[in-house]
Regions:
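A basic- and aromatic-enriched beta-loop-alpha substructure that forms the phosphate/nucleotide-
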Residues: 66-104
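A glycine- and Lys/Arg-enriched "phosphate-lid" helix/loop adjacent to the NTP-binding pocket
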Residues: 88-162
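Hydrophobic positions on the alpha1 helix immediately C-terminal to the Walker A/P-loop
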Residues: 17
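The conserved Walker
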Residues: 10
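NTP-dependent small-molecule kinase module
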Residues: 138-194
């Protein structure tokens, strides 16, 4: 089984590109998908960056991936990954002043992240420039972030991928969904996975 994560900032097109890649792969392979876990979560948006919610999202992501892998698909496509959850935690931690337990909590989440990330065959980092994100966000009713937030988060993705040597490929999602999906398929072919 090859586990492929689609990661990136909100509004970048992860879910849409994943769906198209899933359609293409399913023509020849058994494919299962792990959906984005946030829409069905018990947390409001402003509560999502706390320790309890991050622990929930990280452990739920691991559990859902394990459950879906029991069906032994050839490809397991994940709408988001532990990379996304870990970076949400790091961003929130940078914005808040910590209490005495912050270091312990951070160490626990980091241990889960470091343990689980090698289970991904590769990560597709879906990217879009600020103007595209602003336009998509308005159309989709997504929360508008402070100026520079998307850029800072995108930079944090790049730094983390490089520092942790995560096998990742950037897909700039400015073109059609078909073209973005084809870029992903080319990378999978280059890796000799298809």
């Amino acid at each position: 089984m090859h586990k492929i994560a689609f990661s990136g900032i909100p509004g970048s097109g992860k879910t849409t590109v994943l769906a198209e890649v899933g359609k293409l792969l399913s023509l020849k392979y058994r494919v299962d998908e792990v959906p984005d876990l946030k829409p069905g979560s018990p947390f409001d948006y402003d509560q999502r960056a706390g320790f309890v919610s991050m622990f929930y999202f990280i452990t739920s992501q691991i559990n859902e991936e394990n459950i879906r892998s029991q069906g032994r698909p050839d490809f397991l496509l994940c709408d988001g990954s532990l990379l996304d959850r870990w970076l949400e935690w790091r961003s929130a931690k940078a914005e808040k002043s910590g209490n005495g337990q912050a270091a312990e909590r951070g160490a626990l989440l980091e241990s889960l992240y470091r343990f689980w990330m090698p289970s991904y065959t590769t990560v597709f980092r879906i990217r879009a420039d600020a103007m595209v994100l602003k336009e998509r966000g308005a159309k989709a009713g997504l929360q508008e972030f402070a100026p520079g937030h998307s850029r800072q988060t995108d930079e944090l993705y790049g730094q983390t991928i490089q520092q942790d040597r995560i096998p990742a490929f950037d897909i700039w999602n400015h073109q059609s969904i078909d073209e973005s999906a084809q870029v992903a398929m080319v990378h999978l072919a280059d890796m000799k996975l298809i």
